[in-house]
Amino acid sequence: MTLIYPATADAFRCIADACRHTCCKGWEIDIDPDTRAKYVAMTGEIGQRLRDAIADTPDGASFRLREDERCPMLNDSGLCDIITACGEGALCQICADHPRYRNEFSTFTEVGFGLCCEAAADLTLHWPQPMTWHTQGGGTRPQGSPEEEALLQARAALIRIMQDRTRGIPTRLNALCEAAGTVMPTRTAAEWADFLRTLERLEPAWDTVLARLTNAPDDLPDFSPLAVEQFTVYLLHRHVPGALLDDDLTGRVLFCAVSGMLFLRLSTLLGENEAARMYSSEIEYSEENLCSFLDELDAAGDE
């Protein structure tokens, strides 16, 4: 299968123990069947620790998190004992992939880097050139199905709108909505905060952020044009392909535009990197929250 990567791919590096928000804490870490079998067969102290750490359920295996929600294989220095003892090749699939996400098409797969990872957020938001994507090993991308190609052409046009640096960010976000046949909802910062409070919370600190958003001015700040561009382009790249499954291209584009606007507001409160990391963690990495957001935007369109 041909893989398509963003221009940032070669520059991405996990910052390991320097990470302030480790991906080895607070998440359910599933263990794929092949890796589980490998862990069960391992000898020595690391093998015993792995067997003790595996929780088997009817839905599959996962790591049994500690009381502080840290993975039992994450040591006090913030490093993974599996990597230290056995190398990166011993990681389960989800750990080897993270923070990568995949968009699966009929003849190729797109791979990107989720912004819940602070290293990926820092790299993506401050990438100076308009984001591009490249086929692994060079060459051209294989042709997809007619439906896929139509959607990819639409997405490319939307990304061009967002990358038009002759226009301001609010103009670009509104142009995205117009291209999708909709308009940006006219809600205050406090109203958006009220909606976000109805969603599942993954970090307690999110409540504090939403309280600050409630009191934020309603005028959009003139702030972080590069970061907002890259953030919104990332969302378009990642979420527009979902329309192949739910046939909701308009809703998904509106989600990207609204999220770009909210990121702009949150960046003034938290800074660019933390705003992206928290928003991605709270919204993108909860399927329930993402679906609720799309439903809310669908309802807003009927108002």
Where are these regions (language model features)?
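Compact, glycine/acidic-enriched structural inserts
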Residues: A41-D52, H126-T135
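Internal, well-ordered alpha/beta segment that forms a basic, Gly-enriched binding/recognition surface
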Residues: G78, I82-R167
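Hydrophobic, aromatic-lined core segments that form the binding pocket/scaffold
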Residues: R155, I159-E303
